[in-house]
Every structure is written in structure tokens, then in C-alpha cells.
Amino acid sequence: MARLVVDGEDVVLRLTLPERVLARRREVRLPLTAVREVTVEPDWWRGLRGLPRSARWLPDRFCLGEWRHPEGRDFVAVREHGPVVVVDLRPSAPFDRLAVSTPDPEGVVRAIRQVA
């Protein structure tokens, strides 16, 4: 399962080895100044918007990679059944949103809010 952590002045989405292979990237690193809002969505599918662009997904199982929508693009690492951390980003960031399934979503939100 992907991990969303604060590393110094950055928010980092670290992917597991299988996720790295599917997403074709090791991590997504963004400055904390790019974070506009961070919340927990109780249903995993609520973090998704738009359509997959360079993404892998299995319906009702997982979604991983870049999703396009009319306002821009999001990076998602979402697994079925469970809450997701949704990080909405400022226009200067390469993505508009990160949506991530994590083992402790409330803890991740607290950690980001403390430093952002």
C-alpha cells in the first residue's frame, strides 16, 4: 500500500515496488507550500475524478496513476473499500490532487496539517 509522508519541506507519496512498476514512477514529491487542503474521504471512489490517462486500474479493486479531468490532472493510488486521503493542490503544482489509500488516513492528515 502506498504511503503519504512529510519529508522535510515536502509531501511525498511513496509507492510499493508493484505500484512503482504499474505507475512507472517511484514517488510523487511536492513542496508543502503546494498543499491547499487535505481531507479524508470515507469512500475510496470519492477521491477519483475524470478518466485514467496513464493509469492502471481494475474495477472495484484499485486505481493507480494519472487521471485527467476538465480542470487538469490528478495522481491516484487508491485501493477498494476504505477511506482515502485527498490532498488538493495549488495551481503551481504538477497535479491538481493526490488521492491515496493509506493505513492511517487521519494520522496522515494530522501530520500534513501540522506543518503546512
Where are these regions (language model features)?
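Acidic, Ser/Thr- and proline-rich intrinsically disordered linker/docking segments
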Residues: 23-32, 36-116
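Conserved beta-hairpin
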Residues: 1-32, 36-39
